[in-house]
Amino acid sequence: MFNQSFLKYMLFGFFLFSFHAHADRIRDLITIQGIRYNQLIGYGLVVGLDGTGDRTNQISYTTHALKNMLFQLGITFPNEQNAKFKNIAAVMVTTKFPNFTHIGQQVDVIVSSVGDATSLQGGTLLMTPLRGTDNKIYAVAQGNIIINDKNSVERFKNILVNNHLNNGMIINGATIEREMHTDFGKNETLNLQLNNEDFTVAQEISKKINMQYPKSAVALNSKIIQVCIPNNNIEQVEMLATIQNINIPIPIQDAKILINAKTGNIITNQTININTCAITHKNISMTIAFNKLKINRLVPNPIIKSDKNNNKTLNDEQIYKNNYNTNNFQYLEKTSNLNTIICALNLFDITTTELISILQSMHDAGCFHAKLEIT
């Protein structure tokens, strides 16, 4: 039921944001164009598995990769057709290459099985070159793989732990062998990219930068602020450090509700006020008026009867006519925001699909003023 997985399927942030404007540092609002992560990838072998590796008689590329590796070590490989191993697995190795990383530094890598291995638990990744989009080798990975422990759920029964046995990590598993080329510091201008496009914020950032460095910044659009920078690399670093720590007053953000239809997660960026409305969805009826909420859910296949006083009964149980004591009826005072309404709906064990349908209907009817995005 929905209420049994309320925390799993719904997130209303950690706290609902207020409507008051606040100040953020520029560094929290932008990224610097050209400073980013670069992706590296490589193909390798994991050995030392306890009978959970690829079935080499069916996965030919695992045996072929092992043959090539042993050949480079000067070892003659036996007939591939008769070779059967259970302790090796073919894997793809990926990592993110940060900017300004130098030779000898180490980064974490992700190891994922590409064959039919059942688990990478206890395996060791053999030396694997990691290449960029230009096919050049930038790092070499090797080490013991760490995956989720099967006993994690038993030790932490109140925490949901997923055991992805065919996917693991090697902490500091790759060593940088080549530095990535970057154009940072070679141009006379630098673009600051807003994480969320906003003309007001872009103009405010440009204004604040110009107060510190006159006539150096201009907002090109709602996303890009172009800054003129000195040619000297040391002066560039000093200037950017100063700019990143400038405080910017953030205007009131547009109210937004984001719904993930697959997971059921619902996130809002502020308190959403609700207008007067009445909604009927399947066997659920809801009325909101004068900051009061009434919700009723009928049982399947109800038998409704009316007496001479027009009192309605459901399966011989009175539920209407000023009776708020039954389990199928909720009456709440002073409810004017979306959070309260969802909590009330949760009491009726509604499904995620029903909740999304109700919110969509309320939005279409103008019951609340916020951007609704369903992904």
UniProtKB/Swiss-Prot annotation:
Superkingdom of source: Bacteria
GO aspect biological process, one term: bacterial-type flagellum-dependent cell motility
Signal peptide location: 1-23
Gene Ontology cellular-component terms listed: bacterial-type flagellum basal body, distal rod, P ring; outer membrane-bounded periplasmic space
One GO MF term: structural molecule activity
Subcellular location: Bacterial flagellum basal body
Keyword terms of this UniProt record: Bacterial flagellum, Signal
One Pfam short name: FlgI
InterPro entries: Flag_FlgI
Keyword Amino-acid biosynthesis: no
Keyword Protein biosynthesis among record annotations: no
Major place of residence: other
Quaternary organization: The basal body constitutes a major portion of the flagellar organelle and consists of four rings (L,P,S, and M) mounted on a central rod.
Function: Assembles around the rod to form the L-ring and probably protects the motor/basal body from shearing forces during rotation.
Family, per entry: Belongs to the FlgI family.
Protein name, entry field: Flagellar P-ring protein
Source organism per UniProt: Buchnera aphidicola subsp. Baizongia pistaciae (strain Bp)
